């Protein structure tokens, strides 16, 4: 099966300013069909230059975001939860404005906030309630929320495929699906391909990310296993390359694991084509 492939622009840095827009043409030139853009700014006017260039190039677009402690959607403080909900609704609005249909990320709870214990049922209930509030708004904008699990060093609420699958089933909303990221699966799953097949009916979006967070095919992720799982899950969505620069503190990338961003973008695309047998 032929898949459409997108590149996440975080490879160029965390601030989606106009200096990063210039790289969109190269992403298109390499062969990518779309881009995935992080939403940290919720002023629609900020995104006008992005929309203009995306439309000019004919790229399709997806968005991602995450929450900090001050917007934790499972906080015991209702005001904090509401702040997270309000931010996500604005991110949905930006997503729709850009012409995107998917907003993904680990926003079922906050990034890198820990209680020192496993999640309580109350925390899971708060997550469900928060996601339902955002999902209703997303539905009105024709946007799907793709929830992502993170590895246990970045999140304690959902840190494996089965936990996220259970949460999405509990939320039970047509605009809430799973976004599967191979980086976290490489750490947490016994068999990534089998995990993909097991949760296939709820997977709507897939990120391909190497163990080094750099060039696909140059780390320890078992890509043969990943693409075997992909071939068995009847997935018809997109494949998105996610790689990070040391400029993104939240990713804890303290050294550069690639030569240049341009080479990373190109080699990752070429390696995906090899794995797909294209």
Regions found by a protein language model. Name each.
Residues 1-13, 17-28, 158-180, 185-278:
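Histidine-acidic metal/acid-base catalytic patches
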Residues 47-58, 130-138, 195-198, 225-230:
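Catalytic-core regions built around general acid/base machinery
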Residues 1-100, 173, 201, 255-278:
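N-terminal pre-domain/capping segments
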Residues 18, 56, 79-177, 259-262:
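Active-site acidic/histidine proton-transfer and metal-coordination neighborhood
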Residues 36, 63-65, 104, 146, ...:
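Conserved beta-strand positions in the central sheet of alpha/beta enzyme cores
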Residues 70-75, 111-117, 153-154, 187, ...:
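A short acidic, helix-capping loop that chelates divalent metal ions and anchors anionic groups
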Residues 36, 148, 154, 189, ...:
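Acidic-residue sensor for enzyme active/binding pockets
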Residues 11-13, 39-41, 67-70, 107-111, ...:
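Active-site-proximal loop/turn and secondary-structure-junction residues that shape catalytic pockets
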